[in-house]
Amino acid sequence: MKINVYSEKSGNFASDSKMKPMIIIESKKKTLESLKAQYPDAMIIDVTSHAQDEFVKFSPFYPNCGIPVPFTDDIAVSVEGIWQGLKVFEDADVDTSYFSKRDMKNLKRTVRKYGPCLGHRKGVHGEELLGYIEARKLIYLPCYKWVLENKLQKLVAAVRIISKNKPVVLLDYNTNPDVNNPKKPLSHASLIKAYVEGNYPE
């Protein structure tokens, strides 16, 4: 699969491996033209499920496969499948069928269909329900980190190398980098940035 990134100026890679990575998170909703104008020297990389190149694998919806389900003796094909599958609603418990969904579509379990969300179950057969922020820390963060470390090291290395030589703009539909902010969905692009910079949240 061809990697397609956007840059106005190619430039030469610097040899100083100690240069601090330059990674910026921007909204996928912005036009490519406006982003190029704002960051004329940057490499712009789409890391959403709508990316048209290999960087789509960074999407939590992508079926990277073999992902251990936290507190459960099972594996899943995507991070989002785990996140949605372990949700517990007023009218529905966990749904392990989401662990095997590969098409990156219809992965959301909504309150409109199932009633208020009560939390995330701590394991498929667990009795404890986790709050939103706690679930982020115990389910989402370790699952996404596992994917970065076990499935995407070549792409992570590519982002790291490029970002030491020119700014890299990662496009995501969500831009919230604060794990402890319950008001906005967490940006997975911010987790890529944090991982590359060596400060992945725990």
State the predicted function of each range.
Residues 2-6, 12-18:
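Short, positively charged and aromatic/hydrophobic N-terminal segments
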Residues 16-202:
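Charged, low-complexity intrinsically disordered segments
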